[in-house]
Every structure is written in structure tokens, then in C-alpha cells.
């Protein structure tokens, strides 16, 4: 693994000289191996180690190099054709491979190569970009987008039209992370490497980036870039210091633990937030 990492790190430093026609075989092989690691889930762009998220930047660099190494090519689809550098993950899958993976992929979902989708996950007609990790039991609902290298935990529900930001465009240092047992409401957007910690519930139409104020109404504390575990979050506003205007903020209206979540439905958690 260290040798693979070293080859990719060196190639990335010299990426301007790399093209589909000029790249050394060593670099091609290293990038292909890295994408295979991501595809199988044996490698992740980010993982939680000793309670802290650690980003493996070399795998993200492998994803970026993949684009340097490939020309656009025709991709066959059921009703159409496409033209891109990155093939789709399931293009040549057999029934046996689908059964072994244990995930449901509903047409016309688009899942790019270099993506991992865990057992009992359901991918409705949506888009999952290269480098993403979608863990077991997660629902990616209709028209949701899972951005490049995003990390989605176990038993997460990404509701219809949700956007989870990627790292490639614009280039971000760290991936957006949704931890286990989270619910992200319809049309919400979580971007720019924000971490939504375990067991949180994000209501419909909440937008969170690194500069978004995440206000805890119980404590008065303001967070940036992180939704604390067990938070129930709705869209709101905070007044300016002079009281002349207000600006958008995400508001933590309550905290819940795993026991409460098990007893109470998501809709109940979002009711009575006044």
C-alpha cells in the first residue's frame, strides 16, 4: 500500500505532464488499483479512526488522476448513449455480482466506477459520484446527489433531491461526511466538507456549508462545519447585532439519543419544534 501511495503522490505532483497518451504504465496501474480499492470498499477516502475522521488524501488524488488518464468515451445506456471519462460501476454486472453485493440499484440511477455501495443499500434514480462510500442499509432517494468522495454512513436516509457535496469541483480539502443513522430531509444541501454526526436529523430544505452558522437554541452555542451528534436541525435565521436584518442559519432545536430515535418516528421529531 505504501508503494502504491508513493507512486500516486509523485504522479499528482507532476500531474500537468500526465495525459492519456503520455502516462507511464506504472502510474496507470497504480491509479487503477486505487480505484479498485474504492470500488470494493477496501479503501476509503476518509474513515473514522479512534473517534476522529482521517482523510486519505492520496486516494482522493488517485480519483483526480483518473480524469487525467482517460479520454471521453461512449457509454451505453438503456435508452440513450453518454460520453464521459468515467465508466459506470454496474455496466457489466451480472445477476450473480448484484446478488453478492446485496444492494438494490433502481433504474436509471447513475453510479460511477470507484464508488462503494454496501449491502442492503437502495439507490433510487439518483447520482453517486466517483470516490463516494455509501454504507450498509442506506437509502439514496430519488434525484439525490452524492458528491465525489462523500462518505455516507450506515442506515442513513438521503431524501429526495438531497445534495451531498463533493471534493472535485470546486476542489475541497476534505469530503462531506454523513455519519451513521442520520436522516437528511428533502432538498437539503450539505457541502464543503461539513460533518453531520451520528443520529442527527436534518429537516427539509436546510443548507449547510462551512460558513453556515449552526445555532443551538438550548445552549446559545454556534458551530461551524459540524452538526453535533443527535441534533434535530431546521432552517431558520439569526438577527444581526443591530437588529436591522437577519441572515440564514441552521437551528438545532433539540437533541435526541438513540433510544428516543428508536421509539419516535422521524416526523414526530420534527414536529413541535417551536
Curated annotation (Swiss-Prot):
A single GO molecular function term of this UniProt record: 2,3,4,5-tetrahydropyridine-2,6-dicarboxylate N-succinyltransferase activity
Pathway where this protein functions: Amino-acid biosynthesis; L-lysine biosynthesis via DAP pathway; LL-2,6-diaminopimelate from (S)-tetrahydrodipicolinate (succinylase route): step 1/3
Catalytic function, reaction form: (S)-2,3,4,5-tetrahydrodipicolinate + succinyl-CoA + H2O = (S)-2-succinylamino-6-oxoheptanedioate + CoA
HAMAP family: DapD
Source species: Alteromonas mediterranea (strain DSM 17117 / CIP 110805 / LMG 28347 / Deep ecotype)
PROSITE patterns listed in its UniProt record: HEXAPEP_TRANSFERASES
Catalytic EC class: transferase
Keywords assigned: Acyltransferase, Amino-acid biosynthesis, Cytoplasm, Diaminopimelate biosynthesis, Lysine biosynthesis, Repeat, Transferase
Organism phylogeny: Bacteria, Pseudomonadati, Pseudomonadota, Gammaproteobacteria, Alteromonadales
The protein, known as: 2,3,4,5-tetrahydropyridine-2,6-dicarboxylate N-succinyltransferase
Main location: cytoplasm
Localization annotation: Cytoplasm
Amino acid at each position: 500500500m505504501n508503494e502504491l501511495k508513493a507512486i500516486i503522490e509523485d504522479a499528482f505532483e507532476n500531474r500537468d505532464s500526465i495525459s492519456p497518451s503520455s502516462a507511464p504504465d506504472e502510474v496507470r496501474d497504480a491509479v487503477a488499483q486505487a480505484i479498485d480499492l474504492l470500488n470494493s470498499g477496501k479503501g476509503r477516502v476518509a474513515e473514522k479512526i479512534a473517534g476522529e475522521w482521517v482523510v486519505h488524501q492520496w486516494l482522493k488524488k488517485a480519483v483526480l488522476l483518473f480524469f487525467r488518464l482517460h479520454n471521453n468515451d461512449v457509454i451505453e445506456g438503456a435508452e440513450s448513449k453518454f460520453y464521459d471519462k468515467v465508466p459506470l460501476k454496474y455496466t457489466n454486472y451480472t445477476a450473480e455480482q448484484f446478488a453478492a453485493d446485496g444492494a438494490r440499484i433502481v433504474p436509471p440511477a447513475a453510479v460511477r466506477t470507484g464508488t462503494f455501495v454496501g449491502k442492503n443499500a437502495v439507490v433510487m434514480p439518483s447520482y453517486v459520484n466517483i470516490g463516494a462510500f455509501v454504507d450498509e442499509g442506506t437509502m439514496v432517494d430519488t434525484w439525490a446527489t452524492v458528491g465525489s468522495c462523500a462518505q455516507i454512513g450506515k442506515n442513513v436516509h438521503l431524501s429526495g433531491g438531497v445534495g451531498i457535496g463533493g471534493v472535485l469541483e470546486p476542489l475541497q480539502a476534505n469530503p462531506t461526511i454523513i455519519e451513521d443513522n442520520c436522516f437528511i430531509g428533502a432538498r437539503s444541501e450539505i457541502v464543503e466538507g461539513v460533518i453531520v454526526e451520528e443520529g442527527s436529523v436534518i429537516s427539509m430544505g436546510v443548507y449547510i456549508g462551512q460558513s453556515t452558522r449552526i445555532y443551538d437554541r438550548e445552549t446559545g452555542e454556534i458551530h461551524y462545519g459540524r452538526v453535533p451528534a443527535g441534533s434535530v436541525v431546521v432552517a431558520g435565521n439569526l438577527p444581526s447585532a443591530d437588529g436591522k436584518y437577519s441572515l440564514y442559519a441552521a437551528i438545532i432545536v433539540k437533541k435526541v439519543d438513540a433510544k428516543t430515535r428508536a421509539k419516535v418516528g422521524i416526523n414526530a421529531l420534527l414536529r413541535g419544534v417551536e
